[in-house]
């Protein structure tokens, strides 16, 4: 989805988005219950848990990598169970989470200006992607404005469990509804 601004070779060499510190487990991708059964069949050793902070209203799940950490160091990273370090992501395209397809973009719920105001969603840029930091921000905004931003928000409206809370970390907004 972002191949016009991110080179697949850069992503394949980096794999930052496929490793998780304990403090970034909120970033692990979300799978539907329907996909979970297919994943368990294809990857019998992969472990899953209910997705946190989304109420599990849509029976959403993520992978459980807690047993991959070898130390108490909060900066230690554990890899996605579907990452082959030499081949990249091993998930079939139809099972690859939308979160992964749009990385380093995230859907955030913007803060309300008043209690009576409805929630508004926006597309934010995750600042930790080394490759996207080399791309001019306006180029990212232009891509989002070309239809990708609305496509992402439409998907989020149908899958609210993928929406993250707005924060200082996710404060670079690249798209909101016009």
Regions found by a protein language model. Name each.
Residues 1-178:
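Short loop/turn segments that flank or connect secondary-structure elements
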